[in-house]
Structures are given as structure tokens and as C-alpha cells.
Amino acid sequence: MVFSNNDEGLINKKLPKELLLRIFSFLDIVTLCRCAQISKAWNILALDGSNWQRIDLFNFQTDVEGRVVENISKRCGGFLRKLSLRGCIGVGDSSLKTFAQNCRNIEHLNLNGCTKITDSTCYSLSRFCSKLKHLDLTSCVSITNSSLKGISEGCRHLEYLNLSWCDQITKDGVEALVRGCRGLRALLLRGCTQLEDEALKHIQNYCHELVSLNLQSCSRVTDDGVVQLCRGCPRLQALCLSGCGSLTDASLTALALNCPRLQILEAARCSHLTDAGFTLLARNCHDLEKMDLEECILITDRTLTQLSIHCPKLQALSLSHCELITDDGILHLSNSPCGHERLRVLELDNCLLITDVALEHLEHCRGLERLELYDCQQVTRAGIKRMRAQLPHVRVHAYFAPVTPPTAAGGGGPRLCRCCVIL
């Protein structure tokens, strides 16, 4: 529908400004910018700061430069509560200093992938943005411990901080952070490879409200650090230890005895964990919903039996490369309350003992949405077809190597690779 100038003028006269602003508040960035071009009146309405409380510039990341952020900050001022600059690699410290000065009520700021920023940006946020609750600095590789010291002094209401792949961070930075930001509920430290057990001890001492911690690829972390962490963070609900390859059942025991609210555990490539540790965990953590046990190569069907008995809320389970898992383990899982009612995702890549019999058992999992079967060499196309006849909504991901062409009788004749045969 196309409005004439008379129509637009009538709308402006009939509806009060407050109602028009309310209507404009439901529009996205692109639509607001289009409305701003209709008339002077609509330009004022569309660009009113109250309509720009939440801005996500990810879809425009290649076009966003520092001046764009500065202009937005001047227009929005104290109205802006949430800004995402994820992937905006053209934005640097100077622009974010202007932003921090103008938008002092900002609560949620995403700088994921803004690789130009340095500690200077964090100093600006610390100085001007005391209401900040959520900060994402993923892959801001120039960030150092100095940033964390600044944040701890000026952003004491911080609840969520993502420092993934900021690999200059050490235990000293973590100590400075948690001393000042004791209300942290989520701390993501993926790829912070310099962190050691002492960093976890600092978290244990000060972050008693912590519910989510990601330590993926923090390979220097040992059982001692995890044990200390669990003792000080009893509210922990999500923990990623994937790639912390030295951990043993002592870590699982600490989780089982101290963190009964645990819902998500990612322990991929923790190859020393065994059935004994997961048995104790299952018997104490009944709220488990998601588990990534990829390459926990020592676990057997016993772990699945315990999960099926004690963890009725389990929704997603990765057992890729757990080569001791058999059809019997899948039977226990499928016949359990979680199998019947909750299980949505099951990953069995490279589980070499799994056969079509396991797929028959999985037909009982009526809620199953995705099944990974790559390189399960005893699973057949026919078995998958039978299962999908019972579960037509399930997405099955599997790979079957192309059949090798038979060798010509007598070995004579030209030999063609399969690519050439296809062509």
C-alpha cells in the first residue's frame, strides 16, 4: 500500500506523538531508516532516541565504521540499552570511547570479533558505563589483564563476560576481575590457554553466584582446580571442560558432590574419565539435560545405564568416538524415561560396535530430532530406512562410502578412477 502526502499528514494529525513513537518502536533498523525518508515529521519520529534502545548491526558488519557508531551514540544517548557490533572489524577504540561517553545507560554490549579494540576500550567502558551487565569480548585478541582490572573497578554490576580466545589473559587478570565483579553469573574463557588452576581458585573465592563457566581448551587446568571451583560454586548449572585433557574422575566426583543443579556438562576429549566418575555424577545430578562426552574413550554401556536410571531430563547426548558403546547401552537409554520423553539429539559418530539393532531400540524415542551416525560401519541404509519409517521427523546424518567398481576380468583394460567414471 502506498500512502500519499495527505494520508501521511492525516496520520500525524489524528494520532498523538506518543502513540506514533510507540508504533515506531516495533520497527527494525532498516524499516526505521526507510520511514525517516518519508517526511520531516517521520524523520524526527523514526530517529527519536527512544526507538533505538536495542541495536544489532551484525547484518551490516562490513559497512560499519567508527563514525557510524559515533553517530548512533550521539542520536541514542541515554536511551540505548543494548548494542551488538559483532563482526564489525572496522570499529576501534576511539569510536567506542565516544560511544561510552554518550551511552552511559548501556547494559548489554557485544564486541565479538571487533579485533581492532584494545585495553583502551575497556578503560572507557569502566569509566563511563557503570550499568553494564553483559559484555562479549570474544576474539578481541589485544585485550590483556589490564582490561579486566579496569572492568572490575568500573563495571561492578557485570553478570556475563565472554573472554573466549583472548589468549593474553592470565590468572592475575581473572583475580582482578572476580574481586570487583562478584555478581558474575556467566564467565566464558574458551581458548584462554594461559589459565591454570589458580585462576579457578580465585573464581571459587569470589563468584558464589556463578551458574555458567566455559573452560574449553584451557589445557593447563587440572583436577585440583576443578575441585576447588566446585566447592565454591554450588549453583553451577553449565560447565564446559572440553579439551582439558588431564582431568580424571576426581573432577566428576567434585561435581557430583558439590553441584547438584548441574544441567550441562561438556567434557569432549577428556579421555581419562571413566564409568566410575559418570556413575557418581548421574546419581547426584538428576537435572542433567545436555552432555558432550565425545572421545571419552574409556566409557562403556555402564555410563548409559546410569544416565538412563538417574537423569530423566536428558535431551542431548554426544558419544562420538566412544568406541566401547554397544547396542545394549542404546537399549537402556531408549527404554528410559528420558529416552521416551526427552531425548532430542544423539551423536554416535565412530561408535564402531553400534549396529542396526541400536536403531530398532531408538524407535522408542518418539521425540528424537537428530541422529549422527557418521562412520558407524555396522549401520546400514536399510536399518536407517526402517527407523525413519517409525520416526519420519528425525534427521539422520550418515555417510556410506561409494561402492568401488569391480575389477575387470583378467585385470586387463584401462583403469579409471571413480571420478572419471562419474564424469
UniProtKB/Swiss-Prot annotation:
A lipid is attached at C420 (S-geranylgeranyl cysteine). LRR repeats lie at residues 61-87, 88-113, 114-139, 140-165, 166-191, 192-217, 218-243, 244-269, 270-295, 296-321, 322-350, 351-375, 376-401. GO terms for cellular component: membrane; SCF ubiquitin ligase complex. One of its GO terms (molecular function) is calmodulin binding. It comes from the Eukaryota. Keywords: Calcium, Calmodulin-binding, Isopeptide bond, Leucine-rich repeat, Lipoprotein, Membrane, Phosphoprotein, Prenylation, Repeat, Ubl conjugation, Ubl conjugation pathway. Residues 9-55 form the F-box domain. The CAAX motif is a signal for the geranylgeranylation of FBXL2 and is required for its association with cell membranes and the recruitment of substrates to the active SCF(FBXL2) complex. This is F-box/LRR-repeat protein 2. It comes from Bos taurus (Bovine).
